[in-house]
C-alpha cells in the first residue's frame, strides 16, 4: 500500500463517518415533522419487517403534521400500528382509510435540551470515529517507513492531520446546525 492509498482510504472512511453522524442527526426530532424521522420505522408487511420508506410516500403539509400514504392500501393498519409504537414520539396518529395523519406535539424546552444532549453525544461518537480512523491510518503510514522515504511518510501524516481536522470540523458544523434547529421555537 502506498501513502496515497492510505490517505485515499482514510478520506473515504472519514467521509462515511461524517455522513453517518448527519444521518443520525436526522433521526433526532426537531419541532417539525420530518419524513426522514420515519424512513426506517419497521412495519410488519406480509410477515416480514419492512422499512416504512419502502411502503409509503411521506410529506408534511404543515410544520408538525406528516401524511403517510401507503402504496398498498392493505398495509394501512400495519403502518398505523408501527407509527403508534414508535418510542419517544408521543404523536397523535389518525387513519382515515386512505392515509395515516401524524400530528407531533410542540416540543417543551426541557425536551429540546434533552435532544441537544443526545445530538452532542452522537457528534462526539462521530469525532471519536474520525480519530480512530486517523489512528489506524497513522499506524499504516508508520508501517510504510521502511518501504518509502521518511519525508513522504511525514507529508502523509501532515495530510492525515489536515483530513482529520476537516472532517471533525464538518461534524462540528453539522452539530451547530442541528442545535440551532432544535432550540428554534
Curated annotation (Swiss-Prot):
Residue ranges of the region described as Disordered: 147-167
CDD domains documented for this protein: RRF
Keywords per UniProt: Cytoplasm, Protein biosynthesis
One GO MF term: ribosomal large subunit binding
InterPro entries named among the record's database cross-references: Ribosome_recyc_fac (IPR002661), Ribosome_recyc_fac_dom (IPR023584), RRF_sf (IPR036191)
SUPFAM superfamilies: Ribosome recycling factor, RRF
One Pfam family here: RRF
Record bears the keyword Transmembrane: no
One BP term from GO: translational termination
Cellular compartments annotated: Cytoplasm
GO CC entries: cytoplasm
PANTHER family (UniProt xref): MITOCHONDRIAL RIBOSOME RECYCLING FACTOR PSEUDO 1 (PTHR20982:SF3), RIBOSOME RECYCLING FACTOR (PTHR20982)
Function per UniProt: Responsible for the release of ribosomes from messenger RNA at the termination of protein biosynthesis. May increase the efficiency of translation by recycling ribosomes from one round of translation to another.
Similarity annotation: Belongs to the RRF family.
NCBIfam families in the record: frr
Descriptive protein name: Ribosome-recycling factor
